[in-house]
Design a protein with these regions (language model features):
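Domain-level signal for soluble alpha/beta catalytic cores
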Residues: 1-256
Length: 256
């Protein structure tokens, strides 16, 4: 986070209007960049690069990234670079119903067959506009001609306006969870060295893992093992300092 802060501060002092944290490969890195950049007071956009299966190098999907980063104050979230245009359509469509911020798409002007012509690029970008992308552009291989054709596609496409949504959602890096009235907390789980195994066992008796935070070591274990959970995670603690540390460091969105 400190390294990102140095970069963000330098750009802010140079007079930029917004900050873009792009080609992120995991949610931990993206959170750190956003937390550092937002201290400038400037709008911050965060975009990830994904493979042909719609996941980052760490296995993250766009949906949990959107849920996490929009709750931390990102101005927009989305994708750039990646495996071309077609790889982005499904992740964007999946994220759209739960996005309270604009979605971004800046793909490479190429696919598995090679470079895309400006005309072909503009035609394929229609998929991403249809999927809900509001802020669009290009990454590797794009030229002024590609952007000119994209401009025309945008002008002829109805604008998708982000709407207020009821975000009863939490997330770990690889999964999003949507909370309803049927919450069943497990018995409080200590965040000790056996946390990974305890999280597996909790899946058999509840739909929310309730973790007890009592000391700094508990927070450290949460950060190390919490991302393995296949359940949404809720925290219970009487220590505000520990809670703040856990919320600041956890890769995802928690129930408190």
């Amino acid at each position: 986070e400190e390294i990102f802060s140095e970069q963000a501060t330098a750009l802010y002092e140079a007079g930029v209007d917004l900050l873009v944290c792009e080609t992120m490969t995991n949610l931990t890195e993206a959170r750190a960049a956003l937390l550092a950049a937002r201290n400038t007071g400037l709008p911050v956009i965060v975009t990830f690069t994904i493979d042909k299966n719609g996941r980052t190098m760490s296995g993250a999907r766009l949906l949990p990234c959107v849920i996490t980063l929009q709750s931390l104050g990102a101005a927009a979230v989305g994708l750039n670079c990646s495996e071309g245009v077609t790889a982005m359509a499904k992740p964007l469509a999946e994220a759209l119903p739960h996005a309270a911020v604009p979605l971004v798409a800046k793909p490479n002007a190429m696919d598995s067959q090679g470079e895309l012509s400006p005309l072909r690029f503009g035609q394929e970008m229609q998929m991403l506009l249809d999927a809900g992308a509001v802020i669009v552009g290009g990454c590797c291989g794009t030229t002024p001609e590609h952007i000119a054709v994209l401009r025309g596609a945008v002008d002829n496409h109805p604008l998708v306006v982000p709407r207020e949504i009821d975000i009863n959602a939490v997330a770990v890096e690889s999964e999003a969870f949507f909370i309803d009235d049927n919450i069943e907390f497990c018995e409080p789980i200590p965040c000790d060295s056996d946390l990974a195994q305890r999280l597996i066992e909790a899946e058999d008796c509840s739909n929310v893992a309730l973790l007890q935070i009592s000391c700094q070591g508990d927070v450290d274990n949460l950060i190390e093992f919490g991302g393995m959970s296949r359940l949404p995670i809720a925290l219970h603690t009487d220590n505000a300092v520990l809670l703040d540390d856990a919320l600041h460091r956890f890769t995802g969105r928690l129930i408190v």
